């Protein structure tokens, strides 16, 4: 079971990837991957919080959603996390057109989650 430090390291690694030229919004067309990376940044932030609050590690996305809804410190971000989850599913599995605006919105959502959790 990963610990808080493991999730923190993965969050930082994912966040660093977003800062590379490959995923710079001014030049990339890989908006689907930007959203995917943003989503997994959020996942690891939430897992850090769950480990810190409950010594708990989610087993899957559904379990994490239930934990978010039942954890007082995470409940305020439940709606934006769920919206980011849906957007990541759209980017990963639906093969829909993902735009720069979609990626920018995902990045703003991550900032909100960072403020709530960090």
Can you name each region flagged by the protein language model?
Residues 1-118:
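Terminal alpha-helical segments
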């Amino acid at each position: 079971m990963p610990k808080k430090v493991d999730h923190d390291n993965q969050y930082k690694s994912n966040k660093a990837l977003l800062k590379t030229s490959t995923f710079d919004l001014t030049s990339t067309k890989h908006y689907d991957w930007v959203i995917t990376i943003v989503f997994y940044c959020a996942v690891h932030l939430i897992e850090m919080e769950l480990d810190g609050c409950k010594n708990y590690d989610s087993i899957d996305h559904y379990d994490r959603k239930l934990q978010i809804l039942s954890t007082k410190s995470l409940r305020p971000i439940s709606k934006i996390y769920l919206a980011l989850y849906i957007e990541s599913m759209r980017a990963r599995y639906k093969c829909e057109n993902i735009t720069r605006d979609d990626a920018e919105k995902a990045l703003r959502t991550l900032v909100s989650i960072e403020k709530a959790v960090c």
